[in-house]
Amino acid sequence: MKRRTFLLSGAAVTLALPALANTAPVLKVLKSPTCGCCTAWVDYVRQAGFTVEAEDVDQDELWALKDRLGVTPELSGCHTATIGEYFIEGHVPAPDIARLLSERPTARGLTVPGMPMSSPGMAGPGAGDTFDTLLIGLDGATSIFASHS
């Protein structure tokens, strides 16, 4: 009897996995159509397992989104994404996004300001830059969420 229950439980979980995958939040990215590093970052997060919807927009539309989200120029990157109730600004590493979604802190989102050369979508690991992923709180205050070298 125990073996039958175990096998039925395993089958139920296997059948449920596709439905669970479909409930994962979608990473919606707005980016410039001419930015190669933005496209490389989108490819990177897709390869990391995220479902991504990318849209090419002009700079006015991109900055309008950043303004609505409260992303200041000094905290901005070259592309902006949203996932669930959070924003993801710039070249944020996929493990940081996964951690954000797992821990669910009270915050607006994550940012990697600027375009650090060793960040995902840029020149790649070992390019020389160390960088921090910053958590932006509801009040706009930042704190280091993760450090990368």
Q: Where are the model-predicted features located?
A:
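Thiol/selenol-based redox catalytic cores and closely related redox-interacting motifs
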Residues: 67-149
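Thiol-based oxidoreductase modules, predominantly thioredoxin-like and allied folds used
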Residues: 53-63, 83
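Short active-site oxyanion
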Residues: 26-27, 51, 85-87
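Conserved helix-turn-beta segment immediately C-terminal to the redox Cys motif
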Residues: 44-54
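Local sequence-structure signature of Cys/Sec-based thiol-disulfide redox active-site neighborhoods
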Residues: 25-40
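N-terminal export signals
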Residues: 5-22
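Stable alpha-helical elements in mature extracytoplasmic
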Residues: 41, 58-61, 93, 97
